[in-house]
UniProtKB/Swiss-Prot annotation:
Pfam families: GIDA, GIDA_C_1st, SAM_GIDA_C. Its main location: cytoplasm. Belongs to the MnmG family. It comes from Mycoplasmopsis pulmonis (strain UAB CTIP). One of its GO terms (molecular function) is flavin adenine dinucleotide binding. The keyword Lipid metabolism does not apply. Homodimer. Heterotetramer of two MnmE and two MnmG subunits. One of its GO terms (cellular component) is cytosol. NAD-binding protein involved in the addition of a carboxymethylaminomethyl (cmnm) group at the wobble position (U34) of certain tRNAs, forming tRNA-cmnm(5)s(2)U34. This is tRNA uridine 5-carboxymethylaminomethyl modification enzyme MnmG.
Length: 611
């Protein structure tokens, strides 16, 4: 049966699918959201947290663009802290423990009330394509939904299987449904698939844990939020707990290593480098006497603990032995045993920077299907794919976030330029302009993209511009005001006459609020003042990069026509099809001589065209 045509179809209701759906609905488009389980939209199948190094900044960037992850995380958070607070502003990031049930419930409630969203509790089995243009999606319950725009956000559900030792189940996360239909469809359409793996630890009933044997983590009382729109303040935060592996743990793992699905070569997929299983940590870091294990509550009820650091692919009988060696878990009752999960993804080199497929017009892909790991990375891609699908529907230009404007820009550029052979996780070290990509300036960095995407109002955008105008004016004022050596402030910080307020604020030992009272943007201004020289350097470097980004490469360029271009460069340019000179220059193995040849060829073609 052919159903009513939708403006856009979103396949998958995870973190990427949620962002895409909300963005498209806010752009006033009619969206069909296909999800296997309606009550599990926005579910957190792995860790019950959002944020962390770099990731927390991504969540704030999503919010600055008009996305929803930070807003719902605030509404469901049960604990929040600022990581790396003693370090520089560029590496500080929020991490929040989330009530995973509440998070999903409030998302589902808002989607069900959204008149632009129709939810299909069904399973997508095929993509319908005509003349390299997506035209619809086939569903398991004998329906076809039609649209010229589809956003695929299938997560780890494509051709997935769960492994605990030699015990293999062909299911999705937590024993949920999987299917091979979409994998076959993508292969039929010429996509290169890759096989990836991730894992998850056991979940333990809290009433079986001896908390007297573990360390209670200190709570951060500052009350941070991801989204200023949420108006949230947590009255009472909930503790996490810290313990460690030990000699007994390590011996059991070493003695049984061949029973691990990963070490017995049952797993074909590549696992995440920066989130290794416990057996990987013990085998690769044999010199370490212990590894951290965190007990993290999954909900505000605190009845189930997520055992962070104990991800594993061992069979249940070995997991039982391992769990009993962990202090506090000697008598633990387990709700869910740990497992590894393998799934299909695509090589992301097959995508444009808009996250539209290069092969099939109107088909966008986002999230773990593109080779990433993490809720934050998935949500960021879902938002950009949703925005660009919506802009395509409206006949407007796509948005591409530059590397100096956001971690989201770094993430997508890395994927579509370098590709990945393992689950990609965002790290601060991946961003060459990380001093520009801070928590405190996400609004001014990204609001203009949100405005262009119709997710930020003109009124809200003007407020942001006004904020930074006030900061600039205040900075100029501080340069003309001087500290008197007779004040208590001067005595406290041993300041003599002749120093301006601006110069005083450059000193890291000075508490800004001791000098300036009642300025609402004091934190943002202080960071700007103290990093001024470094920011200027990075802005200059970014400006050079942006000039290369503005040099577009024709979509149908024939690289075989470029004389003196190295064979490796020709092969890589043909495979990746870079959209700009800047992107071409970042491809692995490409050197300055290759770029010079490419520029010379483009100039020659331009001259011939003009003549």
């Amino acid at each position: 049966m052919i159903r009513k045509n939708f403006d856009v179809i979103v396949i998958g209701g995870g973190h990427a699918g949620v962002e895409a759906t909300f963005a498209l609905a806010k752009m006033n488009l009619k969206v069909a959201l296909i999800t296997i389980y309606k009550d599990k939209i926005g579910a957190m199948p792995c860790n019950p947290s959002i944020g962390g190094p770099a990731k927390g900044i991504i969540t704030k960037e999503i919010d600055a663009l008009g996305g929803v992850q930070g807003y719902y995380a605030d509404k469901a958070m049960i604990q929040v802290k600022m990581l790396n607070e003693s370090k520089g502003p560029s590496v500080r990031a929020i991490r929040a423990q989330i009530d995973k049930e509440k998070y999903s419930e409030i998302i589902v409630k808002d989607l069900l009330q959204n008149e632009n969203v129709t939810i299909f509790e069904d399973f997508a089995t095929d993509l319908i394509v005509e003349n390299d243009q997506i035209v619809g999606v086939e569903l398991e319950k004998n329906k076809t939904i039609s649209s010229n725009l589809v956003v695929m956000t299938t997560g780890t559900y494509m051709n997935s299987r769960i492994l605990r030792g030699s015990d293999i189940e062909h299911t999705g996360p937590n024993g949920e449904k999987t299917g091979i239909g979409l994998s076959k469809a993508l292969e039929r359409l010429g996509f290169e698939l890759i096989r990836l793996k991730t894992g998850t630890p056991p979940r333990i009933y809290s009433d079986s844990i001896d908390f007297s044997k573990v360390e209670e983590e200190v709570l951060d009382v500052n009350g941070y939020v991801f989204s200023p729109r949420s108006n949230v303040k947590i009255d009472k935060q909930i503790h996490c707990y810290l313990t460690y592996t030990n000699e007994k743990t390590h011996k059991i793992i070493q003695d049984n290593i061949n029973k691990s699905a990963m070490y017995s070569q049952l797993i074909e997929g590549t696992g995440p480098r920066y989130c290794p299983s416990v057996e990987d940590k013990i085998m690769k870091f044999a010199d370490k006497e212990r590894h951290q294990i965190f007990f993290e509550p999954e909900t505000s009820r605190q009845d189930i603990m997520y055992i962070n650091g104990l991800s594993t692919s061992f069979p249940v009988e070995v997991q039982k032995q391992i769990v009993k060696t962990i202090p506090g878990l000697e008598n633990a009752r387990v709700k869910i045993w740990g497992y590894a999960i393998e799934y299909d993804a695509i090589n992301p080199l097959q995508l444009k920077k808009s996250l539209e497929s290069k092969k099939i017009k109107g088909l966008f892909l986002a999230g773990q299907i593109n080779g990433t790991s993490g809720y934050e990375e998935a949500a960021a891609q879902g938002l950009i794919a949703g925005i660009n699908a919506g802009l395509k529907f409206k006949g407007e230009d796509e948005i591409v976030i530059q590397r100096n404007h956001g971690y989201i820009g770094v993430l997508i550029d890395d994927l579509v330029t370098k590709g990945t052979q393992e689950p990609y996780r965002m790290l601060t070290s991946r961003a060459e302009y990380r001093l520009l990509l801070r928590n405190d300036n996400v609004d001014i960095r990204l609001a203009h993209y949100g405005l262009k995407a119709h997710l930020i109002s003109q009124q809200d955008y003007q407020k942001i511009l006004e904020k930074y105008k006030k900061i600039d004016e205040k900075i100029e004022e501080l340069k003309t005001k001087f500290v008197s050596s007779k004040t208590d402030f001067a005595q406290k910080y041993k300041i003599e006459n002749g120093i301006s307020y601006f110069q005083a604020l450059t000193r890291p030992d000075i508490e800004p609020s001791d000098l300036i009272k009642d300025f609402e943007f004091l934190n943002e201004m202080t960071i700007q003042i103290r990093l001024e020289g470094y920011i200027k350097k990075q802005n200059n470097a970014a400006a050079k990069m942006e000039r290369l980004e503005n040099l577009k490469i024709p979509e149908k360029i024939d690289y075989s026509q470029i004389l003196n271009l190295a064979n490796e460069a020709r092969e890589k340019f043909n495979k990746i099809r870079p959209q700009t000179i800047g992107q071409a220059s970042r491809i692995s193995g490409i050197n300055p001589a290759d770029i010079q040849m490419l520029l010379f060829y483009l100039d020659l073609k331009k001259s011939k065209h003009e003549n």
